[in-house]
Design a protein with these regions (language model features):
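C-terminal structural segment of proteins
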Residues: 1-292
Length: 292
């Protein structure tokens, strides 16, 4: 286990510590994943933990560009925010946050930690891709922003460079009549998902003008995986149950699912049809209610 615990006061202090300690340091938010990572031997060689809870990054704000969520915002605070709950377009985030249990974890875990950990079985990564989130990173060479879809590279592997840490999650303001949703299958209420999916749909005259279908835990590659062929097949089609059903079939057919001790690839493929259908149906229903 790490030996040094440092509560940083500024972002410059964080980046300096990360540069100094390199792979021996990790930034933590709520610290809810420490035991999980240690038990799997994934903190081997890490000697220093850098706590960013005093940097003032616990907020949910909305401006003309969309949502801004600080990295230290807990799941509970995000779920309670009127900004996230104000539009059906952000439903995937609310669904994913409420699906995380137990409540003690929601009270401690942070959005920045869940995304920057690079763990594919967590619920927020696919939800964040579905709502087209971007992330703001701070480092010794300045700050940069990138699409969250490009942030995940593999199991525990992200686009973070040495000396960088995640400061903020940004969700662009979506068009009117946009809805999103999240669904997952788990073996018990505190387990990682056997399979998860997040979707978003934008309607124009009750036809699909844009769609996203994003699988989370349970796919080969250990990163959120979009079913792009199924997405494209929905565009310009009427938002009917038949179209949703065909998209669910295509998404399950074209995606490569993991085959491991938790579930076979064939089982996950069957589950995918159900989860995608349910998530898309919820997204369409929410899009019809969304006024922008």
């Amino acid at each position: 286990m790490p030996e040094d615990y440092i509560k940083a006061s500024t972002s410059n202090e964080v980046t300096a510590l990360l540069r100094r300690h390199g792979e021996k340091a990790r930034v933590i938010g709520g610290g809810t994943m420490l035991y999980e990572l240690e038990s799997r031997g994934l903190l081997s060689g890490v000697t220093t933990l850098i706590d960013i809870s005093k940097l003032g990054l616990d907020y949910v704000k909305e401006d003309s560009s969309g949502l801004r969520i600080g990295a230290s915002t807990t799941f509970t605070d995000a779920l309670r925010s009127k900004q996230i709950n104000s539009r059906p377009a952000f439903g995937a985030l609310a669904d994913a946050l409420s699906a995380i249990r137990p409540v003690q974890v929601r009270n401690m875990a942070t959005l920045g930690g869940a995304i920057s950990s690079g763990l594919p079985g967590l619920d927020l990564p696919p939800a964040s891709v579905a709502v087209r989130a971007k992330i703001a990173l701070a480092g010794s060479r300045g700050r940069r922003t990138l699409d969250v879809e490009d942030f995940f590279l593999g199991f525990l592997e992200t686009a973070l460079k040495r000396g960088e840490f995640l400061m903020e999650v940004r969700v662009p303001r979506p068009p009117a009549h946009t809805g999103s949703a999240f669904q997952k299958l788990e073996t018990n209420s505190v387990d990682w998902a056997v399979l998860s999916v997040a979707t978003s749909v934008t309607l124009k005259n009750d036809k699909v003008s844009n769609a996203r279908i994003v699988f989370g835990g349970g796919v080969v590659g250990a990163v959120p995986m979009r079913a792009t062929e199924a997405e494209e097949a929905m565009v310009e089609a009427a938002a009917t149950e038949d179209v949703i059903g065909r998209a669910a079939e295509e998404a399950s057919r074209s995606t490569e699912f993991a085959d491991d001790e938790r579930a076979s690839a064939d089982y996950r493929r069957q589950v995918a049809r159900v989860l995608v259908r349910e998530s898309l149906s919820n997204s369409v229903e929410r899009a019809r209610r969304d006024k922008g």
